[in-house]
Amino acid sequence: MGQNLSVSNPLGFFPEHQLDPLFKANSNNPDWDFNPNKDNWPEATKVGVGAFGPGFTPPHGGLLGWSSQAQGAITTLPALPPPAATNRQSGRQPTPISPPLRDTHPQAMKWNSTVFHQTLQDPRVRGLYFPVGGSSSGTVNPVPTTASHISSIFSRTGDPAPNMENITSGFLGPLLVLQAGFFLLTKILTIPQSLDSWWTSLNFLGGAPVCPGQNSQSPTSNHSPTSCPPICPGYRWMCLRRFIIFLFILLLCLIFLLVLLDYQGMLPVCPLLPGSSTTSTGPCRTCTITAQGTSLYPSCCCTKPSDGNCTCIPIPSSWAFAKFLWEWASVRFSWLSLLAPFVQWFAGLSPTAWLLVIWMIWYWGPNLYNILNPFIPLLPIFFCLWVYI
């Protein structure tokens, strides 16, 4: 508390004063108001818990002094804002406008695209940006390396931009194909169940198909015939129906693939010889001379005339198997030749044929949609095979 003989003022009764223990004047300065050795109490001038109750402390000047607090009027002054000279310097300052390039980099204005690309061809410059082993464009001559940590990192990692682009494009395509394939697989797996429901509905015309599922050993509750448990007697019939449906789907896919290969001209089918019902027999079964020179697919069939020499006859470039089947069926069923004019007339796209097709679609369209609805997931697969094969 300093070097004087005063004591502290815990109750705040004598603000900015000291009290001599013996209530006698100090020899240095008898006036306690101007005593240079007194202690300063900043808390005495504040409004707080004093000797006369909470929130009231007599100020300097007497019991009830001259201030407003002494008269019982306590006012709270609002906090003053900081001056304008100081409150605008805090926070992020706006970025100044960059000077033009001709002022900051005058040497860059002397460069054009030709000079720039010629400079990049310099091995010393290329070595800085395309280190050996990391460049994706051409062969780079090695340059004397400077002891730089950054250059050593680039020499180990290489050029990251082309590699990342290739990796991204390399993964994105297979990922999309895998996602589309998984989606089609989930849809294809619903085909057997849909066809099984249609098959079993034929036995329950006018009502919901329900399998009683009664077994003498372990009776089960009523359920759908397409979801029989293994303990149900109808479980073996459900498995048999599913197996037949899978064979039917496989046969449908094989027929589509055969038609596609036949349309592309990839089936070396020998046409029937005029006046005969079968192709020639004998050891001469392969083509010795191609009918169209060097070709990727076989384009001729070898026959054996009476003189014993093999002769190659060209086969159609497309629809060879279809034409072979038509010729084979026409030889065995002569009445099929009567359908040729009708097929040609229908293929002529006459207005009558178009009206007939439109009427058939309008009349049988909804029923056909219900029948062909399970096979809709197969259409994208057939379309992709037709386009890419």
Curated annotation (Swiss-Prot):
Residues bearing glycans: 309
Intravirion topology ranges: 2-242, 192-242, 359-364
Region (Pre-S): 2-163
Swiss-Prot/TrEMBL domain comment: The large envelope protein is synthesized with the pre-S region at the cytosolic side of the endoplasmic reticulum and, hence will be within the virion after budding. Therefore the pre-S region is not N-glycosylated. Later a post-translational translocation of N-terminal pre-S and TM1 domains occur in about 50% of proteins at the virion surface. These molecules change their topology by an unknown mechanism, resulting in exposure of pre-S region at virion surface.
GO cellular component, one term: membrane
Protein name: Large envelope protein
InterPro entries associated with the record: HBV_HBSAG (IPR000349)
Signal sequence, renumbered to the chain: none
Residues where lipid is bound covalently (N-myristoyl glycine): 2
Cross-referenced Pfam families: vMSA
Gene name linked to the record: S
